[in-house]
Amino acid sequence: MELDQIEAFVAIVRRGSFTGAGAALALSQPAVSRRIDLLEHELAAPVFERTRGGVRLTEAGRAFLPYAETLLASMHDGIAAVRALERPDHGAMTLAIVGTLASTTLTARLRSFRAAYPRVELRLRTALSREVSELVRRGDATLGLRYDVDPDPELVCRTVHREKMVPVCAAMHPLARRRALDVSAFRREAWVAFPARRGAGGEPYTLTIEGRLAAAGLGGAEIIPIDSLTAQKRMVEAGFGLGLFPVSSVDEELRAGTLRTLPVRALQATIDVVLIHRRRAYLSGAAQSLMTALSQWDVSDPRRATRRRRTRARSRAGPGRRAPGRA
């Protein structure tokens, strides 16, 4: 069995056709077909079923796919390890993240990383939690940030942050004007969330929202499925529902006054932010540095650090004296 046969097999799966795989590999369609014929001969089983709409995996193909992806990922790791011997601060690295995590805390760390490693090309991909795991598992991403621990033993998971989630509404929503609220005020309200996916592939973010509503006695509440965080926030701002969002993802809207938090403790929640990588993956020095930065999520928040510095300065200045640098 040759490596180019496995490359062709995985390319067809990801591109959905022999033609697409040929374009990705710079091969003619007959050349791709020849490689698959040889692979199927080696396996003594067909890996694809040809249909009018393209191709789909056979049972043998589905069984072979994770091993093929692992083999290719290991090969790419080996190439990266050898290249790093001569050029340790060069190369490319992909970080896959859940879109709701693209907060000022994360972007500050990514800017610092780029400043420290200007010759490393850092690529970002956004996806749902289960998709982040899949990108890391098959080697398309070096590191991933997702919600909740993935039980897959092939992935190393490290909880780096516990994100607070708060209920919010539009500034002009009737609930925003009420000082005292209890759960009964939400009986007829709709909520926006990412589309639910049941079973093992369910999105932890959506499951957390549904679980919190159910625990508060609102299990029958209407959920408006919207697959974009930005669209969710715009819908809530327009009054088309309420949201249960990570605080970091609505920080700007809360400061601008277009969204208001709802002071109902029963509807507050937390969700773990988890950093993942493949258990046997090669991690360059740059990747390890990024892991360290992401693992210190709560340690060096610029806004918290500024507040701490000002507090210490006031303490040193003593009563009746201004801290340096303050007008």
Per-segment meaning from a language model:
Residues 11-31:
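Short helix-boundary/capping micro-motifs
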Residues 39-40, 113:
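Conserved amphipathic alpha-helical core elements
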Residues 40-59:
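A short LG(V/I)-centered, amphipathic sequence patch enriched
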Residues 90-153, 226:
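Central regulatory/effector-binding core of bacterial HTH transcription factors
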Residues 128-133, 137-141, 146-147, 204-262, ...:
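Hydrophobic hinge/microswitch elements
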Residues 153-159, 163, 178, 230-279, ...:
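Beta-alpha-beta core module
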Residues 155-195, 202, 285:
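Flexible hinge/capping segments at coil-to-helix
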Residues 189-216, 283-287, 291-292, 297-309:
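Secondary-structure junction motif
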